Amino acid sequence: MKREYQEAGGSSGGGSSADMGSCKDKVMAGAAGEEEDVDELLAALGYKVRSSDMADVAQKLEQLEMAMGMGGVSAPGAADDGFVSHLATDTVHYNPSDLSSWVESMLSELNAPLPPIPPAPPAARHASTSSTVTGGGGSGFFELPAAADSSSSTYALRPISLPVVATADPSAADSARDTKRMRTGGGSTSSSSSSSSSLGGGASRGSVVEAAPPATQGAAAANAPAVPVVVVDTQEAGIRLVHALLACAEAVQQENFAAAEALVKQIPTLAASQGGAMRKVAAYFGEALARRVYRFRPADSTLLDAAFADLLHAHFYESCPYLKFAHFTANQAILEAFAGCHRVHVVDFGIKQGMQWPALLQALALRPGGPPSFRLTGVGPPQPDETDALQQVGWKLAQFAHTIRVDFQYRGLVAATLADLEPFMLQPEGEADANEEPEVIAVNSVFELHRLLAQPGALEKVLGTVHAVRPRIVTVVEQEANHNSGSFLDRFTESLHYYSTMFDSLEGGSSGQAELSPPAAGGGGGTDQVMSEVYLGRQICNVVACEGAERTERHETLGQWRNRLGRAGFEPVHLGSNAYKQASTLLALFAGGDGYRVEEKEGCLTLGWHTRPLIATSAWRVAAA
């Protein structure tokens, strides 16, 4: 029975024991052959790759490198991580020693469609923010989003072509390995110059990553899965921009420079989404904040800087009516104070190019009874190249006075600061003739007194010097703003509102001027506006980035100046309705002047844009004992 079973078993098994032994030997021989075929160098590293599969594995590794390299050349770290972030981090790759299968599984994951872009968060709350900073004035928390990536925003709603992972035949794949690869910026795809691939699948396990040719991009985009497109809402971005500026200023005030640095990096991206004046003023405030955060102060004045400052001042005079208004209203007050006087003396605390005085000289020349003898003392800072710029201004004014037959005398006083002036410097030279009429003095200051507030006691000394010469009138023109607050956040907020209105007026005035009189080719209309913006930008930088004696743009309001001058022994002089009417007429003649407003405030005149006063002119005299 046993033999029969064995025979039956043998016949049913299809072979004898000898045959089974030979099969076992063949299997062992095959395994040994496979072990001998494994690449020894990779085997030493723990990877089992047969020599016959080396070409296929090398091709797959090249494809994986190209696919992962498309994350962006401009920002390799963050961009590459963002591109392959959709790889399943929890995927278990069984037997990682099988390098060929492992790489192929990673390629299959890369070939999967990208996850959709999450929708933009609502304006009120941004869940993606990584830091929360309290807004200005304790008005709440501003949750600011991370800086927007320009590649994720578009204004044109068109299909976005995605990188295509397509299979290729072996011959094309072999040539692809020999060609030079290109890496382009984020959103573009890597391509091989000599490889050709189809959008359909192939029999080969190898694959290459390349951009679809132009003829097939439309079809590829149509077949690709829909990707949400983030469209920038300029109004929402504008709100976020203001929040970012205020939050950065608060972080600076709290000396949290890490948060301030993170916020200041978002401002240029948010400002780029805006247009017109908002973009420009935000750029200047962003630069000023960056200078303060990184402790990079503006360089000291040089020869080029001094000449450039004079050039900016001249362009600001031409582009907008603020300096014209200041000169006109001050001259009107001086002209009325000089009525009936035959010897007059004007002390100008900041003569610059002397643009204010030709109009006054002409008005005096047309006065009934003939012009008086006119003496002008111009005060200015020393020039870095040691040139006598003040004397050059005097020569030009003397030539003009000669043409209109006005007896004119000029003297220039070089002073690093107005606090260096003494009363005897402003008195007439030589002994006064007893038979001559005493000289009537007027002191004029246009945007000069606020600089003295950077030095303790300097303003009081200058006002004391002015009081000692007993002028008949003192004209003061200053910015109508409080940029001298001890709180940096309050000062920043006030200056942001002030200069935003100032930039709006430049935009509105230039557009109105272009409609009435379009500039000729190569004209200076655009240049005047650009240089005026730089003129204001330098003030912004000084208000925000500087502290201590370096911060000279310490503007104060009309009420604050009223208190300071009152304590120094001066009383206000009413400018009168005549000056108001003439100033309004001047603005009517200025192109684009519809938005400018002249207001009379407690005997003073202010010029502003719509409802916001921007500069104020006041007149003063020595108070009666």
From Swiss-Prot:
A motif (DELLA motif) lies at residues 39-43. Residues 232-621 form the GRAS domain. Residues 241-278 are annotated as: Required for possible homodimerization. Residues 1-34, 167-209 are annotated as: Disordered. Belongs to the GRAS family. DELLA subfamily. It is found in: Nucleus. Residues 441-542 are annotated as: PFYRE. Pfam families: DELLA, GRAS. Expressed in nodes, internodes, leaf sheats of young seedlings and ears of adult plants. Weakly expressed in leaf blade and root. InterPro entries: DELLA_N_sf, TF_DELLA_N, TF_GRAS. Induction: Up-regulated following GA3 but not ABA application. GO terms for molecular function: DNA-binding transcription factor activity; sequence-specific DNA binding. PROSITE patterns: GRAS. This is DELLA protein SLR1.
